[in-house]
């Protein structure tokens, strides 16, 4: 009949502009304030949604807070309707609605007439919201389990702020390193700013200024790995010494996390990949959100973990770093997990895959994560003793490596992996089985594993 035809690709300027914006408020503004058809459509549905939400306040809830929370908790919105309205500017958008002949609820007009132009307001560490019933601002009564870093920072608790990370005093002798990447604020890839801030925080603990630390923030994802552009640039320019130095800097930092004088509690959530896993694993304890998608995925880009990830997986496979390695089965499982770049689909699965330890804490409500991590850090700080440096790691050695090589050869013959995949697998097997020095009767130490890990990483980075 000719009625069917291929779908035309539609492009709107407002979407392009919004995509380039970094934070949610700027994205929403870009979508609503443009002059193309896409923006007009977005404003139309947004204006109707905001007015509808305002009209429902006294019907389905006594306050705006529970409506916002219902949309966030029940429907996965990043912000509730009244939080969105604040982002857009209440007075500005209300004037626009009135000029377009829309009927704005009277309680919003009364709020604006009172001199208040936002539904929520933060002052001196306290958050208030406008109550239509009382026709005045009301203090937001947060649960003692909740901890909002942005709210806490209004109390002048930021010790130092860098481009991508900040040091924050959480109170009670606990320090926090918060990530806020300026390059990719949703993925938070590791850069030198992260490493410098973590090292500075550990220095402050070692000097006795703080007794414990939390590694965590409240962004979209914990950390999606290293800055691959930097590694690629060094590799393209054959700057192997600089690349090796960068990897060693990361390794040294993760070892400092492991052996710090005070306990460090990591709080991973959502995407926690590659280098993000390597930051989390050496901590004294982890308080993970139930929805944590964790994995060492370096094999996917032709590398192996380079920031200590192999060492952590070995220690985790040895049941928390103690006891003798069983006849290679545990390392074989680790080899499969890292070699196939398996990503846990939950914090519980991350325990099963060996990314997390069995005694790590899992929480369902992310609003409770920082407070839970802080409480755990305080508990651990009592008579805290750093772990013992391991010089007694008994790994499978050449015998175990041969078995892994045979498995790789079988995968290659079946067409499941390429020649280069096989090469990556052999490098990974070399590290996990303890290189040339290891064997069931010969022990290796932690630094040796880190050294051969770094050598393998740089070697693979040089492959074309």
Residue ranges and their predicted role:
Residues 224-226:
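Extended, composition-driven regions rather than compact fold-specific motifs
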């Amino acid at each position: 009949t000719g009625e069917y035809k291929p779908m035309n690709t539609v492009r709107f300027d407002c979407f392009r502009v919004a995509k380039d914006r970094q934070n949610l408020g700027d994205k929403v503004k870009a979508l609503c304030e443009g002059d193309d058809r896409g923006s007009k459509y977005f404003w139309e549905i947004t204006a109707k949604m905001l007015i509808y939400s305002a009209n429902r306040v006294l019907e389905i809830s006594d306050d705006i807070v529970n409506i916002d929370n219902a949309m966030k908790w029940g429907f996965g919105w990043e912000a509730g309707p009244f939080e969105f309205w604040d982002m857009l500017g209440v007075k500005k958008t209300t004037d626009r609605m009135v000029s377009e002949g829309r009927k704005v609820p009277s309680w919003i007009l009364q709020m604006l007439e009172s001199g208040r132009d936002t539904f929520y307001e933060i002052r001196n560490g306290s958050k208030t919201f406008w109550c239509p019933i009382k026709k005045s601002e009301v203090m937001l009564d947060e649960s003692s389990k909740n901890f909002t870093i942005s709210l806490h920072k209004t109390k002048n608790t930021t010790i130092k702020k860098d481009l991508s990370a900040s040091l924050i005093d959480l109170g009670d002798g606990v320090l926090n390193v918060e990530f806020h990447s300026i390059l990719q604020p949703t993925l938070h890839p590791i850069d030198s700013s992260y490493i410098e801030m973590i090292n500075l925080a550990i220095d402050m603990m070692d000097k006795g200024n703080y007794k414990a630390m939390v590694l965590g923030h409240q962004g979209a994802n914990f950390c999606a790995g290293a800055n691959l552009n930097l590694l690629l640039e060094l590799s393209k320019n054959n700057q192997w010494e600089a690349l090796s130095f960068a990897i060693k800097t990361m390794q040294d930092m993760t070892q400092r996390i492991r052996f710090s004088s005070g306990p460090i509690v990591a709080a991973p959530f959502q995407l926690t990949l590659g280098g993000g896993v390597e930051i989390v694993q050496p901590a004294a304890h982890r308080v993970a959100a139930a929805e944590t998608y964790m994995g060492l995925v370096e094999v996917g880009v032709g590398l192996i973990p380079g920031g200590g990830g192999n060492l952590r997986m070995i220690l985790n496979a040895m049941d928390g770093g103690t006891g003798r390695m069983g006849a290679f089965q545990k390392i074989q499982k680790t080899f499969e997990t890292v070699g196939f770049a398996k990503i846990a689909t939950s914090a519980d699965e991350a325990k099963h895959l060996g990314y997390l330890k069995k005694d790590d804490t899992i929480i369902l409500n992310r609003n409770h994560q920082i407070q839970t991590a802080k409480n755990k850090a305080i508990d651990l700080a009592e008579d805290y003793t750093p772990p013992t440096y391991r010089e007694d790691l008994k790994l499978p050695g050449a015998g175990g490596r041969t078995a892994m090589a045979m498995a790789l050869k079988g995968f290659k013959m079946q067409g499941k992996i390429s020649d280069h995949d096989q090469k990556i697998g052999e490098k990974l097997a070399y590290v996990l089985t303890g290189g040339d020095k290891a064997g069931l009767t010969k022990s290796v130490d932690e630094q040796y594993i880190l050294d051969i890990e770094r050598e393998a990483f740089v070697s693979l980075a040089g492959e074309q």
